[in-house]
Amino acid sequence: MEDIKQAEAARIAARAKAEADFKSYGDIIWNQFQKYPLSYYSMYGVVWLFVIAVLAPVLALNVPFYANIPEGVGAANLAGIHFPWFTALFDRNFFESGLDIFFNMLIFTLPLNFVIWLVLKKSKGELKRRDFVTMRTRFVLWSALGQSIVFTLVYLGGFREPYVDWITLSGDSSVSTFFPLLKYSYRDVDLSSVILDPDFTHWLGTDREGRDVFTRILYGTRISLTIGVVAVAIYTTIGVILGGLAGYFGKWVDMVVLRLVEVMICFPTFFLILTLRGFIDDPSIFHIMLIIGLTGWTGIARLVRAEFLRLKRQDFVQAAIALGLTERRIIFRHVMPNALGPVFVSATFGVAGAILIEASLSFLGLGPATAPSWGQILTAGRETGKDVLILAPGLAIFVTVILLNLVGEGARDALDPKLRK
């Protein structure tokens, strides 16, 4: 009896050790990626760019966090203590674009998600690996769904409050206010402060309309990252679907997809984008993302097609076919997960490329007219001859593109089995 108990205890201990030592494919790739310090720290640089994009209103906005207005100052209904910054984040008088509303929402939802993630990660040791992975997947899906619903409700609600000039009110000595670090909005126009040199008030000076350049570059981070990510997501989705169909089914499906790819690559991509842009009278950020997404999928499609052609001849796929699994299950459970590694690397480089395309369109005056794009600031610098208006957005574009390319190179090497150390 004692021997049976010892054997059972040994079996449980061996199983626990095996589960603790087990490394998934993602763990292997992550450990390998960490061996490339330049790419690893560049990834954190990209994360910081995203954090800066989210926290832009915390750093620069012409609305105070806190305001205490005494009786007799301003409108009668303004007397008392106010926290206008929190409502201004979703006020369409201050933020017209849905892009800004989305990033402003992340100021509140990201910390909540981070806390939940830490609690979930802390419970990892108490759960079986399969249960932890299931719980993590559900958390990501429910979090994305919840944030999408909240954003849709807020955006469609069209929330507006009566406009209040908080900068003018704060000039009264009896009014107590606490503003962000910079009291400017990227839309503020001050014709009395046109083309000012950098100083303690305007860190990078002002442009032709008196708008603070540093604030516009700060909010321009949102545009660049969003256009890069969303445009790449669009053309990656198209490329994966078409490339997967062509590679798996072959025959006439492959022929049709390849002919479509050949037609698309006959046209220079940038000129094709310019042509499509010409059909839009008043382009928005979403139009630019859609145009880039609809024209950049050919490379992904060819890459996925090649991966599917290689993988469908592998033994594990042939075994799945022999077992009678449905084609949908074979494609989505066995082939596609193994084909997405090179796609991820290509998408990382694609984000940098999309940012450059957007900056080029804005530089040529073909981007959104009201958006604080880095390309627009470059145009102002070219027309006015001010060095800071050229160097500041140029450096921002350079740093962002370099960081993304370094991350892509590290991911490419980490996914290559021949380079594993």
What residues fall within each predicted segment?
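Gly/Trp-centered helix-boundary motif
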Residues: 1-236, 240, 354, 370, ...
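Alpha-helical transmembrane segments of integral membrane proteins
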Residues: 130, 151, 206-421
